[in-house]
Regions:
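Boundary at the C-terminal end of the N-terminal hydrophobic targeting segment
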Residues: 22-24
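Well-ordered beta-sheet/strand-loop patches within structured domains
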Residues: 37-38, 124, 140-321
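N-terminal processing/targeting junctions
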Residues: 20, 65, 76-89, 180, ...
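Bacterial N-terminal signal peptides that target proteins for export
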Residues: 1-10
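Bacterial N-terminal signal peptides
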Residues: 10-19
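Cationic-aromatic interfacial patches
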Residues: 26-137
Length: 321
């Protein structure tokens, strides 16, 4: 729907979620056809002929060297947990590797056939071959590579965060905190993720920043939820970032500039106007057992202070013993 008065709604998982289709489409009506006259032979319709794949030009030596070096960036893009040394590739093997990397960066590594049925957001089909052939012919491989990743600040932020956490992991990670940890120990732990933490800053302010970053209530206290969150291992943090980068690859390449966006994991709703956040508020989202749908739909109307009764399906699954 393209009416300008409609606001787009997106529910996006940033840690884990499932989804349901946003709009149910009515089944297509197949027109009835009369039977052919007796004795008439009906020929089957001709099969569609698939066009041949776009041929890929041979790589120059400079392009060959650049491509082999670029393929080492898989860890930086969240495609692998650790860098793996590989022998240089050449010829068709290298071209195939470029095609595979192009698909992975544009639409993710999960085959659409493996998507859960209830996930509504699916990546659009993408064939990297035509654009790769053009980039080779025009000697613009770096520009082609830059065009593959999602054009969102959220993805760029995750990429930068991934580099930060990989450095923390490579220097030994962080120790677990206890409930009775001293202020200096807690401050040192927070400083690993937040370089603005100083020895003279009140611990309350540093804790509040960390709590906001993790979608927690910014009490400034080292409560049970905050302690549990800070004690998540750096490897688990890296895995979560990589999963979120993959989900960004499933998103459409253009989001409506006027939209309501929900961070399911943090339970925060943000209103965007002109592609800029103008307000945010807490939202009610599900749990790992009863997950919030991942969807994209249109908001047609808003009911203020609506009467609401617990649906029987929710009552049976979540309330009744």
């Amino acid at each position: 729907m393209n009416r300008p008065d409609l606001i787009r709604f997106l529910a996006l998982p940033l840690l884990a979620a499932t989804a349901i289709p946003a709009v149910a489409q009515p089944p297509a009506v197949t027109p009835t056809q009369s039977a052919p006259p007796a004795g008439q032979v009906v020929l089957p319709p001709p099969m569609a002929v698939m066009p041949p794949p776009v041929p890929l030009p041979a790589l120059s030596q400079a392009q060959d060297d650049w491509a082999n070096e670029w393929l080492k960036s898989g860890m930086a893009e969240g495609l692998m947990a650790r860098s793996k040394p590989t022998a240089p590739m050449h010829g068709q093997q290298l071209l195939n590797a470029l095609l595979d990397r192009g698909r992975a960066l544009s639409t993710g590594r999960v085959d659409t056939a493996d998507f859960l049925e209830v996930w509504a957001l699916r990546p659009a089909a993408f064939d990297p071959r035509p654009s790769l052939a053009k980039a080779i012919a025009e000697d613009r491989l770096p520009q082609w590579a830059a065009s593959l990743t999602p054009p969102y600040s959220g993805y760029d932020g995750l990429r930068k965060g991934l580099a930060t956490y990989e450095k923390i992991r490579d220097t030994g990670g962080w120790p677990s905190l206890s409930a009775g940890a001293s202020a200096d120990v807690v401050r040192a732990r927070l400083a690993l993720e937040d370089k603005s933490v100083t020895g003279t800053e009140p611990l309350t302010a540093a804790l509040q920043r960390a709590q906001r970053r993790y979608g927690l209530n910014p009490t400034g206290l080292l409560d049970a939820r905050t302690l549990t969150t800070l004690n998540v291992s750096v490897d688990d943090r890296i895995a979560a970032i990589m999963a979120n980068m993959e989900r960004w690859r499933w998103m459409p390449r253009e989001l409506p500039v006027n939209r309501v966006q929900v961070n399911i994991a943090a339970a925060v709703l943000t209103v965007f106007q002109g592609d800029e956040p103008v307000t945010s508020m807490r939202a009610v989202t599900g749990s790992p057992t009863n997950q919030t749908p991942m969807l994209s739909s249109n908001i047609h109307s808003i009911v203020v202070n609506p009467p609401w009764n617990v649906p029987m399906s929710i009552a049976r699954k979540e309330l009744f013993p």
